[in-house]
């Protein structure tokens, strides 16, 4: 009995002794889930042997790089481990994490929108992150240290208003563009800021009031003068267009700033008068002699006369112009028609009221001479608001059609697994496209508009673009499903086509897969031509696509073509510049020289796509011999030579095509790729030529191979 009691007592002691440790090691379920997803998003790296993709106990099992307090994760430190992939989409659940260090790895993609919200230290330096510095950083009020250096970030979407505790900010060696945000003035604890090796522009005046000790702005595009307050700190400024001399004098009429006394405010006139009175005993101290007084009196008389002259002139001009304003009032208000949902008519309603604008400019010039009396100010505002009314109404009229869905960044991150590489469908001129699968099973394609394509951070501008694209309605134009405009990010959501792009079919398909036979190629050419005909000749005003290429022709399950990016390049402000930088062999000669696009340049690009369908070759292929690298230069001389034409046909067709159909197809190509734009046909004529070709092909009963007799393989007709 005694022995049994001893054993029982020992068991109880063991249980009591181990229970606190067990409870201490149980990790909060939200923290565990966030780390599970983070592990999967980083491609389940072997370097993190204790980590798992589901379940586990990060605190109790001492996962590598994880520090806990109780059941909550408080620190994540995984620097210099060669980690790749992305960071997942549930980091915002880590509400107790105060330090997050993933520096010196190979992590890429966009920074996750959801980051731990209560961080004091965030270090993501020396990775491969792209896109923008996420807005969620703006909410981290406790943040003291932020390092995003040596990545490929382009847009600074951070609002610094709440980051009053931030002491060290390092954004160096990225691709940031534009001016520093005005909210930088809120960085009242900033000691060191590193902005070197970016493309920032504008002035650095916004940093003048900060308590900085170190500032590195080298190798940017800053202009203007260096504030005096920054000249006494550790400042590195080489590689800019800054003026290190004294700042220019203030504009005329601006009171000089005295170092000995602050600039008097509007309520200090009495004190100022007293000061002058007290100093009147010694005119040498006051600095105001009899000549100065006389000058001021004369100046006041002149200014009064000028004001009176303009008041009289303005009254007369108002009487004489009242009739004109009434006559033009209908034209001014006419842009309100833009509220109509008819995309094909919206731009026709825009009017230019030059007479009214001129009068508005004249009166505004007279206003700048002096503060007007209150009753006159009210009268002028009434007139001015009448003239401004059309502009305000026009902007307010931009409404996205009700059939277009609105998504949040969080929605799209979940659907794309935080825009993972596994869901990347392709990367084009204006951004990357991802496959998105939603909870209801629906699959869509999400295009993230690159900040360089839409540099303005104005949601209204993007909404206007979306509204215009949403009105495009044609069976061969990819349909817009929805959009997202949130925290400086702009995304468009399109219908998804499982067969991918024509480019993939022609150039990336595996040899054992079924090749694209002749009739589907003609069908794809005809459908794409009809899409362009719609944009060019049905839409009003006409829409120049600007980006016709095989990668933008998507194929559904029946190989029907759908032209993507329709209207996008036409409405984006920087499209021409971006397209010229990314020419892939589709650009017309005049576009390559001038950088300008037209309906006829679209026709040329379509001809290049037809050449791809005919030959199976890329528009430009550097792996081929120099004489064959440019598809147009190599193929054009052979289009009217039957023997040569047969030899340049895509070998994947294995000679199974109608010779007459092939010849007529080549004739259409030759017309489209004419060097002179005036000789290229309109798309309606191209459509008619291809319709006739398809009709004749369907009537044909045999297929002829190159250098062989007839064949009875009717499937290729």
From Swiss-Prot:
Domain Protein kinase: 419-693
Residue positions, PTM Phosphoserine: 379
GO cellular component terms, A-Z: plasma membrane
Residue positions binding ATP: 425-433, 447
Lineage: Eukaryota, Viridiplantae, Streptophyta, Embryophyta, Tracheophyta
Entry comment, domain topic: The protein kinase domain is predicted to be catalytically inactive.
Region (Disordered): 237-287, 365-385
Listed Pro residues bias regions: 246-255
Gene behind this protein: SRF7
GO MF entry, a single one: ATP binding
Disulphide-bonded residues: none
InterPro entries cross-referenced by the UniProt entry: Kinase-like_dom_sf (IPR011009), Leu-rich_rpt (IPR001611), LRR_dom_sf (IPR032675), LRR_N_plant-typ (IPR013210), PRK1-6/SRF4-like (IPR046959), Prot_kinase_dom (IPR000719), Protein_kinase_ATP_BS (IPR017441), Ser-Thr/Tyr_kinase_cat_dom (IPR001245)
Residue intervals passing through the bilayer: 292-312
Gene3D superfamilies the UniProt entry points to: Phosphorylase Kinase, domain 1, Ribonuclease Inhibitor, Transferase(Phosphotransferase) domain 1
Tree of life domain: Eukaryota
Name of the protein in question: Protein STRUBBELIG-RECEPTOR FAMILY 7
Tissue: Expressed in seedlings, roots, stems, leaves, flowers and siliques.
Keywords: ATP-binding, Glycoprotein, Leucine-rich repeat, Membrane, Nucleotide-binding, Phosphoprotein, Receptor, Repeat, Signal, Transmembrane, Transmembrane helix
Cytoplasmic side: 313-717
Places the protein is found: Membrane
Segments in the Extracellular topological domain: 26-291
Note: Cannot functionally replace STRUBBELIG.
Annotated Low complexity bias: 256-287
